[in-house]
Amino acid sequence: MYTQQDLIQALAQLKRRRLTAYLPSAVGLAAAIAVFVAGRIQRSDSAWVISTVLTILAVGYFLFLYGVSIKPAKTYCVFLQDMLTGRKRETQGVFKSFSADVCDRDGLPCHSLLLNVGQKDDPQDDRQFYWDAQMPNPAIALGAQVKVESNDNRIASMTALE
């Protein structure tokens, strides 16, 4: 389901997002320092206000973009690394349900999936897994025997058994 190419693309996207946050913030902080130094040299009483405003804007811009753009991309990169190189566990059972609703699981958008590993109608044998919402929905019919390869409870691959 996941390939090394997916990880390379995610890391490239993370790099682009970091640049869009770091560069303008660094320019804003450099401008704030330049205004502060120029104000001290000219003994200006109001230069510190401009310097403070520039600093607040630069830091605010960075914090906003970090929370909205960088952190989700970083979380997805860690997720992909876990799926590709992390320890995986195989579980076999009956594919019981797939939720069309998207939920948040460890910062990632996911669909909930239910797999029954024991007696078909015994709810104590149900296992909940999470399917990455960025991947196409599984093309496996409900009630089919499946093999799920997972890291924690996030699905790395799912195949139908005959």
Segments and roles (model prediction):
Residues 95, 119-120, 155-156:
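A broad structural signal for short, well-ordered beta-strand segments within beta-sheet-rich domains
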Residues 1-6:
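Short, charged cytosolic
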Residues 35-37, 97-103, 116-119:
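Short regulatory "switch" loops immediately downstream of catalytic or recognition motifs
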Residues 105-129:
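OB-fold (S1/OB) nucleic-acid-binding surfaces
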Residues 7-81:
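Alpha-helical transmembrane spans
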Residues 124-162:
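A membrane-cytosol interface segment of integral membrane proteins
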Residues 84-107:
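Structural detector for short beta-strands of small beta-barrel domains
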Residues 92-94, 112-114, 145-147:
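Beta-strand secondary-structure signal
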